[in-house]
Amino acid sequence: MSKVTYRLLGRTGLKVSNIALGVATFGSQWGPRWTMSAAEADALLGVALDHGINFFDTANVYNRGESETWLGRALRNRSARHQVVIATKCGYRTDPRDVNSGGCSRRNVVASVERSLRRLGTDHIDLLYLHLWDGVTPVEESLAAAADLVSAGKIRYVGLSNVPGWYAGQAEAVARWRGWPVPAAVQLNYSALERTIEHEFFPFTAATGVGLVAWGPLANGLLTGRYRVDLEERRITGDGRVTQTFTTGDVDPFRPVVPRVIACLADLAARRGRTPGQLALAWILSKPEITSVAVGVSCGDQLLENLAALDVSLPPEDLARIDEASAQPTPYPYTFLADDIQALVHGPEQLRAARPMTP
C-alpha cells in the first residue's frame, strides 16, 4: 500500500501529508469534467482519509463556493474535522455587483474568511492562502488583516499563492519585521511542463524556510499518459478532460517541450511498469524543496493511482532524463549570472564555493 508521509509546513509545527487532495471538483456548478456528485465527493474524501491524507486544498471560488460546502459536510459526516488541515483561499472576485468582492484588501480578506467559515461549517481555517497577487493592495494591508484573523482564532496560518518572487520576499520580510505571522507556505504551479519557479522560489524557500506546495503537477492531465499532442496540427488526442474542456492558460499544450516530456515519461513508464502520471509525480516528490503536492482527481481510482507514485523511487538516470526532456529556457538575469560571468567575479578556482545557493 502506498505510504503517505508527513512533513512540517515551512517553519511551523504543522504536519501535512506529502500528497494533498485538491477538491476544486467538489460541487455541481462548473459543468462537465469539473464536477461530481455529493456522494462521489464523500466517497473520494473517505479514500483520502483511509490512505493517510490529512491536507485538503480548496478555495472560496471553486465551484462557486460549493467546494468548501461539500468538503465541510464530508468531513462532518466522518467526524474528521479535527484530524485534517484545511487550506482555502481568497482573492478572486465573487460578486459581479460588488467591486470590492475581489482582491486582497483588508475588507475582502476578512469578509472572505467569514463566508468560508460558514460554508465549511467550522470555527477556524488551518491555512489561508492569498490566492494571487491582485496588483494593487499593499502587502502590509493584506498581512495585517491576516494577522488579525490569526489573533482572532479564525485562521491558524497564512500562505501565498500565485505571486511573483519579489512579492513573496517582501511579504516574508515585512511579516518578520512587524512581528506578524510569517507565511507558512507558498502554493505555486509546478510540473515537468512548468519549471519557472525553480529560478526564484527554490532559492527563496531554501533561504527562508517557507514551505512550497505544488499545484498542477500533471499539467491539467497532459502528463497522465492519456493524451498525445500534434504540434503541426495543433491538436490534442485522447479521451479525457484535456480534450473536452482544456481552457486553462497556465499550460500552453503546443510548446515543443510538451510532446517531448510526454514521450519521455511514456518510455520510462513502460520500462518501470508504472504510469506516466506516477513518474511525473515521483519526479516532483524527489525535489527536496517541495513540501506537498496538491492533486486533483475525479474519482477514488485516480487518487489511488496518484498515491502509487509514493512507491516510486526514480534512479538518478531517470531523474536526469526527465530533467533533460523538460528543460526550459533560463530567464534573465539568470542567463547573465551563469558560470562564465561568476568566474569573472570570483575567479574560476573559487566558483563552486562562491555559489552555494545556485538554483
Residues of each region from the PLM?
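Glycine/proline-rich, positively charged
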Residues: D95-E200, G211
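Terminal-tail/helix-coil boundary detector
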Residues: S2, L231-R271, S286-I290, G300, ...
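Short, well-ordered coil/turn segments that N-cap beta-strands
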Residues: L14-I19, G52-F55, A80-V84, T122-D126, ...
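Aromatic-lined glycan-binding groove of carbohydrate-active enzymes
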Residues: I197-D239, T275
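N-terminal binding-site loop/beta-alpha segment at the start of enzyme catalytic domains
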Residues: M1-V84
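Generic structural signal for well-ordered alpha-helices
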Residues: L45, E68, G72, V113-L117, ...
